[in-house]
Amino acid sequence: MAAPKQAARKPRRRDRKSVPVGQAHIKSTFNNTIISITDPSGAVVSWASGGDVGFKGSRKSTPYAAGMAAESAARKAMEHGVKKVDVFVKGPGSGRETAIRSLQSAGLEVGSITDVTPQAHNGVRPPKRRRV
């Protein structure tokens, strides 16, 4: 029986490309806030969320968690050379404004802020009202 062939694999090193201008996509839901920083073509450079930075359960939906997530994503993006971002905000959550402020305070220059929240043209039925 022939011995299995071992292919000599050299370690793949991912080349870190420099992206001076990017886009920050902030998706803020009622349960969490997700920040993705991409290059102009849409390829993700860095991302972070409320759960990613260590919050669990209902704490993920707080503005503080959104700010921490935005700061974390900004730091990772700045390692790739991102200096300026255009911000696209989606969703009704509480962490929208805090995330934008945290991107600025982390050292990223915010060029424009655009709200891209989808509007339903009588699409799906909304969730029922909460009775507490």
From Swiss-Prot:
Q: Which InterPro entries match?
A: Ribosomal_uS11, Ribosomal_uS11_bac-type, Ribosomal_uS11_CS, Ribosomal_uS11_sf
Q: Which UniProt keywords apply?
A: Ribonucleoprotein, Ribosomal protein, RNA-binding, rRNA-binding
Task: Provide ranges: composition bias, Basic residues.
Answer: 7-16
Specify whether Signal is a keyword of the entry: no
Q: Where do the segments described as Disordered lie? A: 1-24
A Pfam family annotated for this UniProt entry: Ribosomal_S11
Per the record, its GO cellular-component terms are:
ribonucleoprotein complex; ribosome
Superkingdom of source: Bacteria
**Cross-referenced Gene3D superfamilies, in alphabetical order?**
Ribosomal protein S11
Any one biological process term the GO annotation gives: translation
Functional note: Located on the platform of the 30S subunit, it bridges several disparate RNA helices of the 16S rRNA. Forms part of the Shine-Dalgarno cleft in the 70S ribosome.
Q: Which family does it belong to?
A: Belongs to the universal ribosomal protein uS11 family.
Q: What is this protein called?
A: Small ribosomal subunit protein uS11
Q: Which organism is this entry from?
A: Bifidobacterium longum (strain NCC 2705)
Classification from the root reads:
Bacteria, Bacillati, Actinomycetota, Actinomycetes, Bifidobacteriales
Q: Gene name on record?
A: rpsK
